[in-house]
Amino acid sequence: MHPFYSRAATMIGEIAAAVSFISKFLRTKGLTSERQLQTFSQSLQELLAEHYKHHWFPEKPCKGSGYRCIRINHKMDPLIGQAAQRIGLSSQELFRLLPSELTLWVDPYEVSYRIGEDGSICVLYEASPAGGSTQNSTNVQMVDSRISCKEELLLGRTSPSKNYNMMTVSG
């Protein structure tokens, strides 16, 4: 098997977790239909997979992390913007639906996020490499975030947060 295909297989869970997280913001506000959400999610998954395909290194998860980072900092991440355009969301609508400050790190075996520049970093998805590089040989868990992270998600805070302990779960 070509090395890219085995690498690509490992990013499926990570991309799905990131897309689900972003899509929840659109769903929470209730301004998009279920069909629009599905189209947005599918488009964003495809865009991220294409964007990451030569920058995914399961053997060195931190390599390329900056390239894979999804960032909203008063500017919209271009990949989120492209997916939103496909469902007819304007830039203004998208900025109303998403936090003005969001960083989402999509790395092999872990997806984490921070809302606000001084917010807590919360782990959204975690997997452990268990002897192989495909999804089937990986112990995968969705990580339940602490109440503080859920509050940040629901409120879309942009103000500095209090210091919270970060909880991670590994199998």
Swiss-Prot record:
Interacts with CNOT7 and CNOT8. This is Protein BTG1. The gene is BTG1. GO terms for molecular function: enzyme binding. PANTHER family: B-CELL TRANSLOCATION GENE (PTHR22978), PROTEIN BTG1 (PTHR22978:SF30). Anti-proliferative protein. InterPro entries: Anti_prolifrtn (IPR002087), BTG (IPR033332), BTG-like_sf (IPR036054). SMART domains: btg1. The modification Phosphoserine is found at S159.
